[in-house]
């Protein structure tokens, strides 16, 4: 009966809030409260802007920034991760939902809610079954390339709001063509508002805080005011539109935003909708998880804390389900907000819950004031935010380090820009998996020899070493499994056919952590064929777990040679000269 009752440690592992709440005190409350104020100030305009990017009503951005933050505070393990709407996921949402319904319709909003629910379920299932390791198969350079291209697409897609024109498109060519075709319809007042806001926000990022500090202002207050730059832009441009009736001059505004707390919403369970959204939900889940965990791990390392990736899946899954049930759309951990949260002094996930309270108050009290907010201001907020995502230096870095990685990154960027975000992210995931399979299917194999005067064996192409014509010593620098077993077979056969004096082949297995069934069958075949050539097969430096598995098969009994503890032992046994020299 006791086995059915989880221990306190097990409960705390699945409910991290029970861990950090035990040491919560007034000082921690103060730190979390200050961080929440700063992040709330930053999140209000961002949530409105990202809803615009997703093609959704502004209030859905606010809704996606309330209950999801509370859910993450309960289930998440990062002390500083700030969950909410983010640019890339908003773009992916627009791409997925835009194929099913027209923007501004109830069907479009319902599809976005359903997408959040599906993403949450996928993340939860991955967390329950501890599938977080699957994210390791995604190449970070490839994902960086996708995010860079997405940043370019996002910024380009918002130019229509800066110019005050109509423009459509799912890729860079379509967007630019549509923009150029409608430039004659540019609204000059909108353009002035948009450009001025972009310039102001870029200056706020780098110049406002130093300027405030130069006046003698306290660093903490200067930091808060600098983070409030986007809010200042919202206030000033909204007042300008209201005072001068600029909406009557063609400046497009947000319009009526319903006030109140998020309503309880129910996602669609229509099988047709689920089948259409499944791939998008899966990709959003994976991309969101990879970026979220990357940010969380980086920030946790700075305070010598740790996160649990599988529990992060649960936390993000709960956040997305909470978003769906409260009228929001897919969310994940935001890089910029998380860094701000960390720098502002957040000590626990409670900072996120306090931020949710701030957003809820904004949804209750401030939404009537957003009626005259220009869409150009929100577009400027998005453009400035996503420019930090654009990093084309990944191309030069991969070119210098690995041409294969460069080709994958370039293909991902190119296809994302030319074909759109859905093709781009699918390509990125596929290329990541192909890169992994390509690299592991062609493991590095080095022929090794004895370094004179030592017991060390090194690559004959890199060091001056001693070898023996009767012995072919090979070091395998990869685990052996179905994808690379044939490569090893071909390598050995090519060498022994070309080098007739060989009587012994020694496989140095110091880097082999695993041998699967396919690789075992290949070793058995190598052993059999070499025996037919009068050549003995030996193993050296086999790790314990690998040896345990080999012992459960008939391979060791059929092995024509021996298993040596070290490569030096093999050299002593197989080359009498080494034993006579007694090198050490």
PLM segments and residue spans:
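Intrinsically disordered or compositionally simple regulatory linkers and C-terminal tails
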Residues: 1-9, 574-584
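Transmembrane helical cores of multi-pass ion-transport proteins
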Residues: 1-454, 468, 522, 554
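Active-site-adjacent beta-strand anchor residues
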Residues: 145, 539-540, 564
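Generic hydrophobic alpha-helical segments
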Residues: 179, 488-492, 570, 574
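Alpha-helical elements of the RecA-like P-loop NTPase motor core of helicases
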Residues: 233, 371, 547-548, 572
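Phosphate- and divalent-cation-binding pockets in alpha/beta enzyme and binding domains
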Residues: 294, 298, 545-549, 573
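The feature marks cytosolic C-terminal regulatory regions of anion transporters and related permeases
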Residues: 388-558, 583
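Short acidic-hydrophobic, aromatic-tinged amphipathic segments that line or gate anion-handling sites
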Residues: 558-573
């Amino acid at each position: 009966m006791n086995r059915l009752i989880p221990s306190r440690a097990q409960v705390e592992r699945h409910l991290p809030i029970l861990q950090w709440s035990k040491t919560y005190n007034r000082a921690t409350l103060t730190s979390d409260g200050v961080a929440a104020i700063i992040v709330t100030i930053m999140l209000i305009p961002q949530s409105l802007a990202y809803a615009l990017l997703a093609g959704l009503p502004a209030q859905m951005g606010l809704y996606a920034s309330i209950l999801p933050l509370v859910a993450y505070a309960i289930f998440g393990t990062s002390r500083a991760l700030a969950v909410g709407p983010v640019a890339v996921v908003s773009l992916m949402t627009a791409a997925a939902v835009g194929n099913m319904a027209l923007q501004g319709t109830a069907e479009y909003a319902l599809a976005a809610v359903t997408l959040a629910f599906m993403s949450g379920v996928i993340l939860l299932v991955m967390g329950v079954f501890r599938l977080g390791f699957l994210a390791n198969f995604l190449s970070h350079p490839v994902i960086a390339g996708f995010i860079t291209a997405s940043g370019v697409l996002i910024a380009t897609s918002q130019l229509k709001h800066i110019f005050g024109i109509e423009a459509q498109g799912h890729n860079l060519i379509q967007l630019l063509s549509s923009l150029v075709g409608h430039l004659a319809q540019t609204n000059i007042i909108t353009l002035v508002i948009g450009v001025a806001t972009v310039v102001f926000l870029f200056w706020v990022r780098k110049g406002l805080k130093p300027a405030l500090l130069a006046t003698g202002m306290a660093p903490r207050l200067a930091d808060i005011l600098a983070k409030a730059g986007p809010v200042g832009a919202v206030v000033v441009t909204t007042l300008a539109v209201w005072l001068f009736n600029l909406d009557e001059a063609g400046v497009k505004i947000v319009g009526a935003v319903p006030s109140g707390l998020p309503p309880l919403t129910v996602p669609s369970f229509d099988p047709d909708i689920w089948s259409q959204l499944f791939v998008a939900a899966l990709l959003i889940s994976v991309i969101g998880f990879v970026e979220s965990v990357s940010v969380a791990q980086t920030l946790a390392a700075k305070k010598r804390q740790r996160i649990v990736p599988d529990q992060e899946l649960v936390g993000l899954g709960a956040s997305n389900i909470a978003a769906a049930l409260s009228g929001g759309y897919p969310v994940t951990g935001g890089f910029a907000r998380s860094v701000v949260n960390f720098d502002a002094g957040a000590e626990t996930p409670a900072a996120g819950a306090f931020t949710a309270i701030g957003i809820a108050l904004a949804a209750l009290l401030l939404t009537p004031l957003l009626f005259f907010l220009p869409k150009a201001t929100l577009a400027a907020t998005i453009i400035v935010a996503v420019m930090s995502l654009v990093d084309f230096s990944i191309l030069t870095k991969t070119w210098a380090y690995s041409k294969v990685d460069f080709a994958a990154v370039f293909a991902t960027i190119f296809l994302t820009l030319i074909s759109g975000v859905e093709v781009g992210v699918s390509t990125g995931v596929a290329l990541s998996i192909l890169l992994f399979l390509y690299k592991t299917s062609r493991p590095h194999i080095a022929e090794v020899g004895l370094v004179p005067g030592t017991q060390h064996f090194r690559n004959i192409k890199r060091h001056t070493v001693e070898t023996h014509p009767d012995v072919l010593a090979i070091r395998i620098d990869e685990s052996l499994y179905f994808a690379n077993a044939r490569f090893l077979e071909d390598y050995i056969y090519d060498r022994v056919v070309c080098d007739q004096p060989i009587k012994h082949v020694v496989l140095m297995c110091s880097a082999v952590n695993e041998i699967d069934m396919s690789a075992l069958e290949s070793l058995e075949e190598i052993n059999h064929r070499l025996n037919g050539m009068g050549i003995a097969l030996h193993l050296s430096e086999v790790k314990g777990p690998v040896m345990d598995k080999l012992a459960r098969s008939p391979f060791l009994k059929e092995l024509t040679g021996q298993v040596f503890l070290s490569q030096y032992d093999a050299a002593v046994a197989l080359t009498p000269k080494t034993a006579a020299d007694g090198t050490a």
